[in-house]
C-alpha cells in the first residue's frame, strides 16, 4: 500500500509543468519572449505567487531554453532548462528553491538517464529514448506542431519525464470545448495523464491558446512550483496569464 501511495504522490507532482514541463527533434520555432504572472487560483488575480519568464540562447551548435520563476520580490523560485546540441536533446534540468529538490535528465544515445534529489536522498534510473519527450520550455512548440490534429479533435500523446519514478509517463493533449475557460477566440487544450488508474487521482490542466496567433495565453491547474505556507511546502493550484514582448 505504501508503494502505491508513493507512486500516486510522484505522479501528482509531475502533472503540470509544466508546466509542465518537450524534447522535439526540431527547435526552429522557439517560444516568443513572454512574461507570465502566476496567481493563486480562486483569488481573482488577488494573490500573485510567481513571475515566469522564458529565455533562449544560441552558441555554436548548442541551444539553451529556460523557464525561470521568481517571487514577486525577485527571489529565485524555480528554473527549468533544456539543452540541445546539434538540434538534438542533450539534457533537461529542474531546480527548485524550496524543498532542496532537483532533477536532471541526460540523453545517452537511445537511452535517457534520470537523477532525482530531495533533501539528503537521491535516485537514479534509465529509460528508452523516444522522439516525443515533452518538457516545459518547448511545450508550446509541440502544441503548434500538432495544432491541426488538436483542433480537429484528436488526442495527441507524448511522454513526460517523471523524475522521482525514473521513468517516462504517458500524457495526452486534447481540445476541451467544455472547459470553463473556453470562449470565442481561444482554444482550450486539456493535458492529462493517460494511465486510467492515476487519472482518478490527478486533475487535468487547461492550456488556453489564442486561435489567431497560436500563443499560449493562460494555464489553469495544479502547479509543480512550490511555496512555503507556515512550516509546510505545498504545490498550489494556480492561474497563469501571459503577456508577450519585454
Region locations from a protein language model:
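Bacterial N-terminal signal peptides that target proteins for export
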Residues: 2-14
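Residue-level marker of positions within ordered structural domains that often coincide
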Residues: 24, 87, 148, 219
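Bacterial Sec-dependent signal peptides at the C-terminal "C-region" and cleavage site
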Residues: 21-32
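Intrinsically disordered, low-complexity segments
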Residues: 7, 24-26, 227
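Bacterial N-terminal signal peptides
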Residues: 13-23
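Solvent-exposed helix/loop surface patches that form functional interfaces
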Residues: 115-186
Amino acid at each position: 500500500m505504501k508503494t502505491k501511495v508513493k507512486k500516486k504522490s510522484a505522479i501528482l507532482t509531475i502533472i503540470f509543468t509544466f508546466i509542465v514541463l518537450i524534447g522535439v527533434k526540431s527547435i526552429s520555432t522557439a517560444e516568443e519572449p513572454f512574461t507570465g504572472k502566476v496567481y493563486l487560483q480562486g483569488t481573482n488575480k488577488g494573490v500573485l505567487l510567481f513571475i515566469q519568464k522564458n529565455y533562449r540562447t544560441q552558441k555554436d551548435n548548442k541551444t539553451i531554453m529556460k523557464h525561470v520563476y521568481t517571487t514577486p520580490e525577485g527571489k529565485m523560485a524555480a528554473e527549468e532548462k533544456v539543452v540541445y546540441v546539434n538540434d538534438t536533446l542533450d539534457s533537461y534540468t529542474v531546480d527548485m528553491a524550496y524543498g532542496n529538490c532537483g532533477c536532471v535528465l541526460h540523453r545517452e544515445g537511445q537511452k535517457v538517464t534520470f537523477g532525482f534529489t530531495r533533501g539528503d536522498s537521491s535516485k537514479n534510473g534509465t529509460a528508452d529514448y523516444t522522439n516525443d519527450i515533452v518538457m516545459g520550455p518547448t511545450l508550446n512548440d509541440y502544441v503548434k506542431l500538432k495544432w491541426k490534429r488538436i483542433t480537429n479533435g484528436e488526442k495527441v500523446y507524448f511522454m513526460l519525464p517523471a523524475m522521482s519514478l525514473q521513468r517516462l509517463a504517458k500524457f495526452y493533449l486534447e481540445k476541451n470545448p467544455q472547459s470553463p475557460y473556453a470562449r470565442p477566440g481561444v482554444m482550450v487544450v486539456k493535458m492529462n495523464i493517460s494511465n486510467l488508474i492515476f487519472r482518478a487521482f490527478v486533475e487535468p490542466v487547461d492550456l488556453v491558446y489564442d486561435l489567431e496567433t497560436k500563443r499560449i495565453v493562460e494555464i489553469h491547474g495544479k502547479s509543480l512550483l512550490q511555496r512555503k505556507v507556515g512550516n509546510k511546502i505545498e504545490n498550489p493550484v494556480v492561474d497563469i496569464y501571459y503577456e508577450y514582448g519585454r
